Amino acid sequence: MTKEMQTLALVPQGSLEAYIRAANAYPMLTAEEERELAERLHYQGDLDAAKQLILSHLRFVAHIARNYSGYGLPQADLIQEGNIGLMKAVRRFNPEVGVRLVSFAVHWIKAEIHEYVLRNWRIVKVATTKAQRKLFFNLRKTKQRLGWFNQDEVELVARELGVTSKDVREMESRMAAQDMTFDPTPDDEARDGQSMAPVLYLQDKSSDFAEGIEEDNWESNAADKLAYALEGLDERSQHIIRARWLDDDNKSTLQELADQYGVSAERVRQLEKNAMKKLKMAIEA
């Protein structure tokens, strides 16, 4: 697939509202039109046919991505990841199977979004507000010396960092939460059927996955490992992670960072993905 088509399909440019309006403006295909385009791609390698198939299904990706709101992840990034899944589905779609592309593509779209959420939610939910980010980068040093805080220590830390006692307690709890596997485990099934596996939460708007993790409150040193791993990244990767997830409330978009570094948005996405992979490996080590 051409670079131009990848840019158009993968990276929502400008405002999200404008992107969604543009996606909805592309006409939906009839079954006959879809099959003709799919045959041109499948048998002739027609990239223009692939482009038309992708553009006509962008609205579907945006609709699916909305079901994964509530994780502190940018909606544009969720759509971008879903679009990657759509492109994979289009590349693998066989018109002779006898199903519509939308039915075939839904698995690929959701799989990419699932992977993205699970790769990033932990880092986002540890520090989602400015006060929590301040705590995240300072609290671990105090905890290494004192361990779990009593109430007097909580109040002391709160005064020193200029936050509330509630903020300190919440961050202490978040820093103790450990990561989860995607699918239910035998241990989950043994706990009165109350599984915390993300596969049961990701697309359920009535459930707050992060809140469930915090309530379960499994102790872990994941936050310490994350902070140390951040220090081990190169300067550009550190800046990308902080600008995208950990800095001020106005998080940078892929395009903004691309303009800053003089590279493509796709290149920034690759750097971000590699940095996230290193952080995840450090957390799981």
UniProtKB/Swiss-Prot annotation:
The keyword NADP does not apply. One of its GO terms (cellular component) is cytoplasm. One of its GO terms (biological process) is DNA-templated transcription initiation. A motif (Interaction with polymerase core subunit RpoC) lies at residues 77-80. Keywords: Cytoplasm, DNA-binding, Sigma factor, Stress response, Transcription, Transcription regulation. PROSITE patterns: SIGMA70_1 (PS00715), SIGMA70_2 (PS00716). It is found in: Cytoplasm. The keyword Hydrolase does not apply. Residues 254-273 bind DNA. It holds the Pfam family Sigma70_r2. Residues 229-281 are annotated as: Sigma-70 factor domain-4. Residues 53-122 are annotated as: Sigma-70 factor domain-2. GO terms for molecular function: DNA binding; sigma factor activity. Its main location: cytoplasm. InterPro entries: RNA_pol_sigma-70_dom (IPR014284), RNA_pol_sigma70 (IPR000943), RNA_pol_sigma70_r1_2 (IPR009042), RNA_pol_sigma70_r2 (IPR007627), RNA_pol_sigma70_r4 (IPR007630), RNA_pol_sigma_r2 (IPR013325), RNA_pol_sigma_r3/r4-like (IPR013324), RNA_pol_sigma_RpoH_proteobac (IPR012759). HAMAP family: Sigma70_RpoH. Sigma factors are initiation factors that promote the attachment of RNA polymerase to specific initiation sites and are then released. This sigma factor is involved in regulation of expression of heat shock genes. PANTHER family: RNA POLYMERASE SIGMA FACTOR RPOH (PTHR30376:SF3), SIGMA FACTOR RPOH HEAT SHOCK RELATED (PTHR30376). Belongs to the sigma-70 factor family. RpoH subfamily. Interacts with the RNA polymerase core enzyme. This is RNA polymerase sigma factor RpoH. The gene is rpoH.
